[in-house]
Structures are given as structure tokens and as C-alpha cells.
Amino acid sequence: MNTFTGVILAGGKSSRMGQDKSALVFKGSSFLHHCKRLLIETGASDIIVSANNKAGVPDIYPNCGPLSGIHAALQQTSHSLLIMPVDMPLLTCEQLTPLVTHTQRTTEALYYERFPLPLFLANTEKVRHILSNILEKKDNLSIRSLIAQLEHEKLPVSNSHFFSNVNTMDDYKSIVVD
């Protein structure tokens, strides 16, 4: 297995939730702690939390969404990145491990069909250059936009339940009840 750095995207404003999503509790631990544990169990050599607070790596390009967090993380390590959002608490190692083990040397981005996150991203000059260009132009600041410009591969999704985002209090209540 390749050496990789785990990245947790936790820099969003959580405006629809009304509070910091990374601190929400699910099955006895915070969303942030759950993500860290998953990345460690998947084999991450290091973990970067992309967040604009004391505990995280700040964005170099502020107010540009998750691409800015990914860009900041790429500057912190020479390893490829396994990137996950803080607000997908149903993810397990079963979804993350194939992203690490199925990568080909020519693949720059590996993700699940229909879901741009979690994402395995090569840390190459080409990837950093393309990402910087997107951020400088501030045109189509989506992860899908980045992926479309890279050599990428999609894995099939067997159960989309694991990829559910928690964006609102209703979303949170629905996963806590399950």
C-alpha cells in the first residue's frame, strides 16, 4: 500500500446546521474524531484537518470551498491524499480502503461514482498546478471540476447510504435515530 496522508475537510461554515458539524456526536465520538480514527485505521501516515481555526490548516485561497482546503493540504505533504469530509459519519474503512488499494500509478484521482468525496488524490506537480489555476480563476470551484481535468477512475457504489452528508439538524436527527 502506498504512503498517504489523510485529509479531513472541516472548514465549511456549517450555516445550514447552525453549529460546527465537526463537534457533532455520533456513536459516542465527534464527527472529527470519527474521521481521524477511520483514516488511521485505513493506514494514513499523517492526518491534516483543513479548517480555518487553531486546530486546522487554514486555506490559502479563502472562501473557495473544499478545493481551497485540498490545496492547503497539498502544500503540507509530499504524499498522496485520502480526502474525506467531516460530515459523512456513516463512512467506514470498507469504503475508504478501496480508494487506497485500487489506485493505479497513472490515476490522479480515484473516487466513487456519483460521489466526489471521499477522494484519493495524487500529489503531483500537475495536480497542484491544475488546482491552483482553478482557484486563481475562481471559476467552477467544485471537486468535480478538478476531477474532470485529471486522469481519474470511478469505483462502483454498492450502497449509497454510507455516503450521506449531514448538512442540517434534520439530517443529523435521521442518522442518530437509525
PLM-predicted stretches and their roles:
Residues 51, 109-125:
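Short beta-strand-to-loop element that shapes/binds the nucleotide-sugar donor at the catalytic cleft/hinge
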Residues 2, 138-178:
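Conserved alpha/beta core of the MobA/IspD/sugar-nucleotide pyrophosphorylase nucleotidyltransferase superfamily
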Residues 52-83:
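Short phosphate-binding loop-to-helix
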Residues 118-147:
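Short, glycine-/small-residue-rich phosphate/pyrophosphate-handling segment
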Residues 34, 69-72, 98, 102, ...:
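Alpha-helical elements of Rossmann-like donor-binding domains used by nucleotide-donor carbohydrate transfer enzymes
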Residues 93-116:
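Conserved donor-nucleotide/metal-binding helix-loop-beta segment in metal-dependent transferases, i.e.
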Residues 2-52, 93-96:
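N-terminal glycine-rich phosphate-binding loop and ensuing alpha1 helix
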Residues 85-89:
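The conserved acidic donor/metal-binding loop of glycosyltransferases
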